[in-house]
């Protein structure tokens, strides 16, 4: 099983890369965080999704509707990243 996480606005590894990876894997899921950038695993509910995946390794039962409610990442951030 494979869990692929992408941020909709990630300039480094855009969602299209995740889509390409998804096409070559069976038993996988690609979740895209709306209005998110790079490194989304620790933002909002992605931490729980990742934890649930590691616990169950079942991509078909992951509760992922929470990603629709993530706050937008600020356009300008300092060198430490956006505020939590």
PLM feature spans:
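C-terminal subdomain of alpha/beta-hydrolase-fold enzymes, centered on the catalytic histidine
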Residues: 1-84
């Amino acid at each position: 099983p494979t869990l692929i996480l992408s941020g909709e606005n990630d300039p480094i590894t855009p969602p299209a890369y995740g889509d390409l990876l998804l096409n070559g894997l069976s038993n996988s899921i690609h979740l895209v965080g709306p209005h998110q950038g790079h490194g989304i695993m620790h933002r909002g509910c992605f931490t729980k999704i990742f934890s649930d995946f590691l616990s169950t390794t079942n991509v078909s039962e992951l509760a992922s509707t929470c990603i629709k409610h993530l706050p937008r990442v600020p356009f300008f951030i300092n060198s430490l990243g956006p505020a939590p």
